[in-house]
Structure formats: C-alpha cells, structure tokens
Amino acid sequence: MAAFNFEAFSLTPQGSTISAAPRPAAPAIDRTVQQQCGSFGYGNRAFQFDFASLESLPEDANPGLTEVLTAKYWNHFSIQLGHWNTLKVIVLDAQMFSIMPDHTKKGVLNTMKSYLGGADAMYARDADNGQVVILAPRRLMESNITIVGSTTVWDPKKRHVQATAEAKIPRPPNAYILYRKDQQAALKAANPGIPNNDISVMTGGMWKKESPEVRAEYQRRASEIKAKLMSAHPHYRYVPRRSSEIRRRAPRRNRAQEVANASPIGENSGAPIVGNPIVTTMEQQQPLPDISIAPNQEITKDNDVSHLIDPPHVFSGQITELMPDVANFLPPMIREGWSPLHDFRAVLNGHTGNNGVDCALTPESESQDDFVGTPSSTMPDNSAFDWITGTEEDLAQIFGQF
C-alpha cells in the first residue's frame, strides 16, 4: 500500500479557511520499548503508539479538522470493506498511520464502529508484518492480542500455539515406564549404538525377572505421580491417539522383509504362488485329455474323439429355446447330433458320398506348379447347397474329395 504524506491541518478561528501547519517534532525514541518490539522485527516510532490512549485523549481543539481528515482517511480505507471481506478487516500502512493525528485515528475508529452496527473495533499491530496496522472488530482480535511495551499486537498463531501447549497434558507413566527410564542410561552405556527397540526388549525381560519388592516400589512411585497430576488437573482423562495419527512403521518393515526374502525369478518357477486364486484354481482342475491323433491314423470307433467335444445340443438347444425363430437361420452344423468330425470322418475313411455328386477338382488344382487360375477355381461349387434343408450326406459329398 502506498504511503500518503498528509500534512497536519488546523482551522482558523473563523473556520473559513484551512492553512497548513508544520508537524510537531518527533519525540525521542524509547529504547526500552524498541528492544521489546525488536522480537517482532519492529522498532519504528509508529510501533510505540499506545492504542489504548485513544480512549483518554484530551478534548479536540480542532473538531472541524478532525472531521475532514477522518472523512478523507475513511474514504481511502473503506474501499477494502467489499462483500469479499467477510471478516471486515482493514489493513493500514504503518507509515500512513504514524502521521495520522490522534483524534483522526479515534475518528476513523468510531466510524468503523458505526459501520459494524455499533460493535466495538480496535487497532492492533500485525505480528507478522511490522509495516501493517490492523483495524478490525474487537471480537475477532481480542483473544489473539499480545501487549508489547505499550503497543497492542495481533498474533493469532501465538494463541494457537499456546492453546495447544496448554491442552497437552502428558500421560502419567506407569511402573514399567519408570523402570525402563532408570535402566536406559546403563544399557546405552554398556551397549553403544543400541536401538531403542532393543532396549525395550531387554528392559521388558529384566522387568519380568525383578523381585516383587522392586516392582512394588515402582508401582508406588507411579501412583504418586498420577496423584499429583490429578490434583493439578482434576478433569484429566487420557485420550488415545486416533489410528490415523499413529505412524504405521510395522507394515513398511513387513513389506521390505518380503521383498528381501523373495527369490529371484526362475529359481522356483515351478512352485505355485501362495495365495494366488488363479493358480489354486488351476491346480484343482483335472488335466485335459489327450485328443491328439497321429497324422496317418484313421478315425475309427476305437479312437473316436467326438465324445470329448461338448455335445452340440448344449448350446444349440439353449439358443432355440430362448429364440425359437433362430432355428430357421442356423446351418446344419448347429443341429442336434452333429459334431465337427462327422463331415470329415467319411473323407478320412475313403468314402465319396452316396448320391454321386461329382466333386472333382478343376484341372488347375491338380498341380500347384501349373496353377494359373483364381483362388475360387480350386474350390468346390457349393453355391447350390441348401443350408436349411440340406443333409450331412449332401455336405459330405461336396467336400468328399478333400
């Protein structure tokens, strides 16, 4: 914010003209206050202003001048009070504030109170920025105020830190905690660099082996500490930390251990992965039957593999039951009693069909070296076959020479 160098004005006795008057000389700086303000990074003259002194100002000698200056300053400051400023906080430049006459400061403060509907307002120095003075409702700043020297300082963060520190009451230690604390120094001296976890394990074993007299003594000490705490804080109640606040270190250690113990790829490639549902399911399945046939082996009743193929009616019956009209559009391969091996069983057994359909290949197909025709010239003419009324024998005759 730019610094405005307003001169101090005074009215003539007649009140008709306004003349400029020189500013009074600045008083000597109070070094004690300056040192106190130094902790906040301040030390200028403006910071020494006693905001509380506005309540006990002497009578204004020039009320007309105060009214004019109050209007000028308020018009400049009130620009910040838009609808976006829900807290109704005005930020003033410290240098501008330092040259404002005291009665003008009080006039701006009273105007702010009127703007707030009669609610009390106050000035305060911002604890984070020494060049800023805050004018805001008292209810907003009063609980966050710190007095430095004679100056009011608004420091919300300090209040939050103090409130947190006051609310945190340490949990009274039990007998074992006191015992561990007494043994920790000796264990560390005897075992340099020992981790705290190992100390806990060692002291736990030592505590179990201690005599009843020693354990009773630590129980007595723990009871005394708890009694003192309850006397100082009668309403104390231990509240465990939420699970989200606990640092989950154990799962990370477990995952790191799993990675370290994992065998490289290929060492146990035949072993199933534990907990893998896919591997477990595959292990429970029966091995698939071997339906392979030698290249020159004929399909006979002894080695017929059609029974290994799902019966066609398993799917064809479901289709026709759900959609009766679809049966008119299905080729004979989907009819009941048909399997993919039926049409070629006769071919492999050397049969050529019953109705004498000539399926001889064209001359172009007799020798692959002399092939000059189109690919369609090597295929049998099956365009006349009726896929709706045709039989398996008709289809077998068409492909009988293959």
From Swiss-Prot:
Residues 246-272 are annotated as: Disordered. SUPFAM superfamilies: HMG-box (SSF47095). CDD domains: HMG-box_ROX1-like. Keywords: DNA-binding, Fertilization, Nucleus, Transcription, Transcription regulation. Its main location: nucleus. Residues 169-237 bind DNA. This is MAT+ sexual cell fertilization-promoting factor. The gene is FPR1.
